[in-house]
């Protein structure tokens, strides 16, 4: 099975993490299906049951992120943040495991909350907290998406910007995954939101945007064959 879909942060211009309506929420999901996508990675957020229910009924596989542990002492000491992360992993899985659309649990994103400078014990414990809570061999555990891999879980994942890529893993033959790519900016007057911009690559018009996106999707097909 070849999975293809977006990293979906579930942010809204006015409600932030809260969608303005059910119709607006599922519109995004329907567009994914209309574009030929068969999965969505829910990034650093846990959605409501209605969102999952739509995915259940319409055949959209969900990769569910564990919201990353904090840094900078925002909710207490470093140790408290770590312990809270392990606990929340179990609670998130317990609260959502009944949704058949969830195909994988994603533990870590780009070393957020991993604290690699402290060694890999915390990273491995975080992965193990998800493995132990999973209780379902039919669901994958995606230990680390991007950056600091620890040879655990079912995936070997890279983040490749702007063009997609993937890595082979002859050691234990984990699933090759390009967890993130793209980041194409096209600035349109009247559709901009104030704030800093993440700039991987920028184009000046819609035709260039579409052509570049086509090149990236062609590259994905090459990776699939490899």
Model-derived features: where do they sit?
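N-terminal carbohydrate-binding accessory modules
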Residues: 1-33, 53
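Substrate-binding/catalytic cleft of secreted carbohydrate-active enzymes
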Residues: 26-32, 39-226
């Amino acid at each position: 099975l070849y999975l293809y879909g977006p990293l979906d942060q579930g942010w809204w211009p006015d409600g932030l993490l809260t969608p303005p309506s059910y119709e607006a929420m599922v519109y995004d999901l329907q567009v994914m299906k209309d574009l030929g996508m068969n999965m969505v990675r829910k990034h650093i957020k846990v959605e409501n049951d209605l969102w999952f229910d739509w995915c259940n009924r319409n055949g959209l596989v969900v990769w569910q992120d564990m919201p990353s542990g904090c840094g900078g002492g925002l909710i207490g000491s470093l140790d408290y943040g770590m312990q809270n992360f392990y606990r929340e992993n179990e609670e998130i899985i317990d609260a959502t495991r009944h949704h058949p659309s969830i195909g994988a649990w994603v533990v870590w994103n780009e070393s957020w909350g991993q604290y690699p400078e402290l060694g890999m014990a915390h990273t491995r414990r975080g992965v193990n907290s998800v493995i132990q809570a999973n209780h379902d061999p039919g669901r994958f555990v995606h230990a680390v998406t991007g950056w600091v891999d620890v040879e655990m879980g079912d995936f070997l994942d890279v983040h490749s910007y702007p063009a997609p890529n993937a890595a082979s893993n002859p050691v234990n033959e984990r699933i090759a995954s390009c967890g993130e790519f793209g980041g194409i900016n096209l600035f349109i007057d009247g559709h901009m939101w104030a704030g800093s911009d993440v700039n991987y690559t920028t184009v000046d018009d819609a035709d260039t945007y579409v052509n570049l996106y086509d090149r990236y999707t062609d590259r994905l097909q090459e990776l699939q064959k490899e």
